[in-house]
Amino acid sequence: MMNKGCCFRLAAWLALSGLPGAGMAEMLPAEEVLLPAPSACRSDRAAVAHLPLRLAVYAPEKDVPVVEALLNVLNAQGVLSGLSITRDKASADAVCSVEGTPSGTGEGYEARLERGGEGRGILHLKAAAPQGLFYAWQSMVQVLSANRTGEGFSVPVFSLRDVPRFEWRGMMLDVSRHFFTVAEVKRMVDAMSLFKLNRLHLHLTDGPGWRLEIKKYPLLTSMSAWRVPLADGEWNWREVKLAIREHDPEATYGGFYTQEQMREIIAYARSRQVTVVPEIDLPGHSYAAMHAYGDLICDGVDFPVEGKKGRDAVCMGRPETLRFVKDVVDELKDVFP
């Protein structure tokens, strides 16, 4: 099991190639930088083009709303900054367009860097759908930031085409065992989008904690979202003790997402071409639900109790359990589009 610290260290390590200043003195061709590797890419090390730090981007009038929204996301990510729309194509540093008929998921794109007079670079990015143009820019983030100089970017000219091999490119974040704040989830989404991952699988419930507000069952989060911190700081499921009452003063580790916070995460991820997929564990791995609502148990054991006590499967034969499942799913459908 990877804990939160390891998870973020891995994300930081993966993102190094996309951070300003991460480039080497030698100019790196696109095929040596891009991760994942594009479908096809060709560079010319002998022809280096130069781009300013703050790129002026041209788009046809019909595409301006799409491109402007995309540049706002890129500026917010902070790896490239100062991206702006220009109406003057001749002076643009990058030319973007959405054209053609989308095939498959519409995530494919083409990109090339040309070298003009006095070594001036011009980026050309083309896709048949907005999501393809988004991924074209994520590739440019990687290539440009790996070739940053003091005054801008110096990059070997290239031409590339990219179409995803897999439609579902996902990562699972277990927020039940180790809670991640909204800000931390957003940071993870940014790292995912940089590397063209498009599904965030949120493991919202398990024995160690329930992490999403369900308005009809408030004890799920007022009790089962909190547990007593482990003394040595190491993960040990057998030692997990959930709050035995609301506002238990000993149960200080944990947290949960309100439904509005989850909608905020979903919208943030959607703007970065990431779909959030919720997971609610049933009928097993349900100790957190049973802990808060004892009528989900077959043998009538009084809950809450401390620790796992060997039981983590709800009783699917009871009308109360079926009603609980339906109610939870109904609220999930209202939150997740």
Q: What spans do the regions from the language model cover?
A:
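Residue-level detector of intrinsically disordered terminal segments
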Residues: 1, 23-26, 222
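Generic recognition of cysteine residues
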Residues: 6-7, 41, 96, 298, ...
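Acidic, contiguous N-terminal accessory segments
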Residues: 23-169
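Feature activates predominantly on carbohydrate-active enzymes
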Residues: 102-312, 316-337
